[in-house]
């Protein structure tokens, strides 16, 4: 199983599948199509049924039940794309056998060093087989590790018919990293009662609560005049954007918040004297606080226009997803089964809120309650990303155990 997971993740990681905010196609990048087609072939090869990829790049497949018991259809999902935060081109995964707890030189030339001094969690992986980057790209274990684990779990169930299970659906979705993953997901065609995203981090993560999320684009308009004759004429939109940013509560940013605390996050600032465009994401677990954050921004824009003239600044706000807890709590048996499945494989469940979102955040509001389980990875979205292959094995075993538990609960 370990070898299969390494082989699969290495193959998937080498395909550049970064999504693209600016694109209006689905998927937003050609690389996601490349991976989708590869997965279709692999699903057929391992013996899955009803293997499809639709016009939007959503891959689906079925593992038929091997028992006549009345077991609800469950699903497992992972996403094709990788984050936009750091390059995913020419990924070159590195394997570290029996990690010794010391510094890992990812790239001697640059240099890039993955050190337990900077990332103390590394000490949890002494003796493990690790997969790392070469220091020049992200790894893409988010979420290609989840794809590898689901694929390996399905192959295990197919080759071990003595493990009884109900009908299982799997899906691999595009554009999750830019919040569009479920936008064209056909819940009716997927035809599952419950599902799990395999899109978490370290060993044991079990999550059924996510942020409420919105995105804001704020455009500042200025007036460009030759600087030599600009007195009382020039309006520098960049300075207005900086002043606006300084009006936001400085301690309510990602680098200063944790647990259930929300934030405003400045993700992009592009401008000139004439025009500056600023992108924010807004996050909070509490729905009323989430709405208050959005109101704060719109009120600040109104204040700006009153002070500097109508049309000086404009805002576009759109909600991305909501806290999935509201939709999962009425079906807590799916969390309980995942909890028991982890314990049955020697994994201590860690139930905590997702300081982010998954496809499950939106799918749960589309009628498919979908909590999230771990993959085994750490430091996602950057050059220090790594994953324990040993914990990938555990994640695969947990997927198998969830299928078993649903079958057992139907007896």
Swiss-Prot record:
As recorded in UniProt, its EC number(s) are 3.4.11.4
Q: Which GO terms describe its biological process?
A: peptide catabolic process; proteolysis
Q: Listed GO molecular functions?
A: metallopeptidase activity; tripeptide aminopeptidase activity; zinc ion binding
Active site per database record: 81, 176 (proton acceptor)
As its record notes, the protein acts as a catalyst of: Release of the N-terminal residue from a tripeptide
Compartments where found: Cytoplasm
Kindly give the PROSITE patterns that the UniProt entry links to this protein: ARGE_DAPE_CPG2_1, ARGE_DAPE_CPG2_2
Residue spans making up a coiled coil are: none
Name the positions where Zn(2+) 2 binds.
142, 177, 381
Alphabetized UniProt keyword annotations: Aminopeptidase, Cytoplasm, Hydrolase, Metal-binding, Metalloprotease, Protease, Zinc
Cofactor(s) required for function per UniProt = Zn(2+)
NCBIfam families from the xrefs? peptidase-T, PRK05469.1, PRK13381.1
Similarity comment text for this entry: Belongs to the peptidase M20B family.
Q: What is the protein's name according to its record?
A: Peptidase T
Organism the protein comes from: Exiguobacterium sibiricum (strain DSM 17290 / CCUG 55495 / CIP 109462 / JCM 13490 / 255-15)
């Amino acid at each position: 199983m370990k070898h299969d997971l390494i082989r699969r993740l290495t193959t998937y990681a080498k395909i550049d599948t970064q999504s693209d905010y600016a694109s209006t196609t689905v998927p937003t990048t050609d690389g996601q199509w490349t991976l989708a087609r590869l997965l279709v072939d692999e699903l057929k090869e391992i013996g899955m049924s009803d293997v499809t990829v639709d016009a939007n790049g959503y891959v689906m497949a079925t593992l038929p039940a091997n028992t006549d018991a009345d077991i609800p259809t469950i699903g497992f999902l992972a996403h094709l794309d990788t984050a936009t935060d750091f390059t995913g081109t020419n990924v070159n995964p590195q394997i570290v056998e029996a990690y010794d707890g010391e510094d890992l030189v990812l790239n001697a030339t640059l240099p890039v060093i993955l050190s337990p001094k900077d990332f103390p969690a590394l000490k949890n992986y002494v003796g493990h087989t690790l997969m790392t980057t070469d220091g020049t790209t992200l790894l893409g274990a988010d979420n290609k590790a989840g794809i590898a684990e689901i694929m390996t779990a399905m192959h295990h169930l197919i080759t071990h018919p003595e493990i009884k299970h109900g009908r299982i659906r799997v899906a691999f979705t595009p554009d999750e990293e830019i919040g569009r993953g479920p936008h064209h997901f056909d819940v009716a065609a997927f035809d599952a009662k419950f599902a799990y995203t395999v899109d978490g981090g370290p060993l044991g993560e079990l999550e059924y609560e996510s942020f409420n999320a919105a995105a804001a684009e704020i455009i500042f308009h200025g007036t460009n005049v030759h600087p030599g004759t600009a007195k009382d004429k020039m309006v520098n939109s960049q300075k207005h954007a900086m002043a606006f940013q300084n009006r936001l509560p400085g301690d309510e940013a990602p680098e200063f918040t944790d647990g259930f605390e929300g934030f405003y996050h400045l993700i992009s600032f592009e401008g000139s004297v004439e025009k500056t465009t600023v992108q924010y994401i807004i996050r909070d677990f509490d729905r009323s606080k989430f709405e208050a954050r959005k109101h704060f921004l719109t009120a600040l824009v109104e204040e700006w226009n009153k002070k500097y003239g109508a049309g000086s600044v404009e805002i576009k706000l759109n909600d991305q997803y909501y806290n999935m807890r509201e939709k999962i709590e009425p079906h807590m048996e799916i969390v309980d089964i995942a909890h028991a499945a982890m314990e049955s494989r020697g994994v201590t469940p860690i139930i905590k809120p997702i300081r982010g979102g998954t496809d499950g955040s939106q799918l749960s509001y589309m009628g498919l309650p979908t909590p999230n389980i771990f993959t085994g990875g750490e430091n996602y979205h950057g050059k220090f990303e790594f994953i324990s292959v040993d914990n990938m094995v555990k994640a695969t075993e947990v997927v198998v155990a969830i299928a078993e538990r649903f079958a057992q609960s139907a007896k």
